[in-house]
Structures are given as C-alpha cells and as structure tokens.
Amino acid sequence: MNYLKLTFDKLEVGEINDLVAHESCGAISLFVGTTRDNFDGKTVVLLEYEAYEAMALKTMNQICEELRARWPDIKHIGIHHRLGTVPVKEASVVIAVSSPHRKSSLEAVHFAIDELKKSVPVWKKEQYADGEGCSEWKENKECSWSKSHRDNHIL
C-alpha cells in the first residue's frame, strides 16, 4: 500500500511509521527532512512550502511505482510532505518504507528522497531573522527543471 499525503498539518513521524508497519516486515526505514536554522550564514526562522498538488501526488505515486519495480519485496511506502509554514526543527518531509529485510527499505528510502527532490513540484521559501535580508524562494538544484540542473546536464 502507498500512503501519500500533502498536508498543512504537523507531520507525525510515529504515525507514518505505524502506517507502513506490517507483521511480515522486519525493517522500517525512515527519512525525516527537517528545517535547519541556517543557510549561507543567514539565520533561518522557518520555511514556507507550496506545491502543484495534483502533479506532486501523481509524481509521488510514480516514485512508489519505481521503488516497487526496483525492490519488489517492499510492503508499504509512506511519503508525506508538509505545505505552508514549517518552523525550525520540524519535519517538512517523511518517507517510510517497510520490507522483510533492511537492505531493500534502506536503499528505497535513499532513492525516494533523491527522486522526490528531483521531480516533485514542491517549492520552498526561506524566511530569515530580522535584519538578515529578505526571504527568498530557493531553487532546488537537483530538480530537473531548474536552471542549475540544465546548465550541468545535456538535455
């Protein structure tokens, strides 16, 4: 089963872990991406996320299909991404994968976050502390439609 969600609510890691748990699985691997308090010497106070929601969910489902093709023993996959305001230390994305053994779930989670960063249409804006400059929308250099990606790859 795939558990995909875009939400403005706080992400609960334990809840997502419970969604993917299964009695036939001896492994659940998790990736939790959180808001850090700094970037390029500036103090970050929060991130704001926006998404093209229908396309984001479709792309997340395609990632799940790819995970299942590469690691057929995977049981459940959870990908939850937060939208709106995400303060420092809170989770913006949680990816959870269950499988009978750890190798598949660990590799799948690593692949999933890389693919999510490359292909899912979610954008973030950093809000800085007072006096440290304006907030700014961040380009995801891994994203296939970014200028940085195009400059470094032959299309």
Swiss-Prot record:
- Top-level division of the source organism's lineage: Eukaryota
Q: In which pathway does it act?
A: Cofactor biosynthesis; molybdopterin biosynthesis
Recorded catalytic reaction(s): these are:
2 [molybdopterin-synthase sulfur-carrier protein]-C-terminal-Gly-aminoethanethioate + cyclic pyranopterin phosphate + H2O = molybdopterin + 2 [molybdopterin-synthase sulfur-carrier protein]-C-terminal Gly-Gly + 2 H(+)
- Chief location: cytoplasm
* GO cellular component assignments: molybdopterin synthase complex
Q: Where along the chain is substrate bound?
A: H101, R102, K117, K124, K125, E126
What compartments host this protein? Answer: Cytoplasm
Q: Which GO terms describe its biological process?
A: Mo-molybdopterin cofactor biosynthetic process
Listed EC numbers: 2.8.1.12
**Alphabetical UniProt keywords:** Cytoplasm, Molybdenum cofactor biosynthesis, Transferase
Q: What is this enzyme's class at the first EC digit?
A: transferase
> Which first-to-last residue range defines the signal peptide?
none
Q: Name one GO molecular function term.
A: molybdopterin synthase activity
Any further remark recorded for this protein: This protein is produced by a bicistronic gene which also produces the large subunit (MOCS2A).
Function according to Swiss-Prot or TrEMBL: Catalytic subunit of the molybdopterin synthase complex, a complex that catalyzes the conversion of precursor Z into molybdopterin. Acts by mediating the incorporation of 2 sulfur atoms from thiocarboxylated MOCS2A into precursor Z to generate a dithiolene group.
Q: Which family does it belong to?
A: Belongs to the MoaE family. MOCS2B subfamily.
How would you summarize the oligomeric state and partners of this protein?
Answer: Heterotetramer; composed of 2 small (MOCS2A) and 2 large (MOCS2B) subunits.
Q: Which HAMAP family match?
A: MOC2B
Name used for this protein in its record:
Molybdopterin synthase catalytic subunit 1
**Source organism:** Aedes aegypti (Yellowfever mosquito)
Q: What is the lineage of its organism?
A: Eukaryota, Metazoa, Ecdysozoa, Arthropoda, Hexapoda
What's the name of its gene?
Mocs2-1
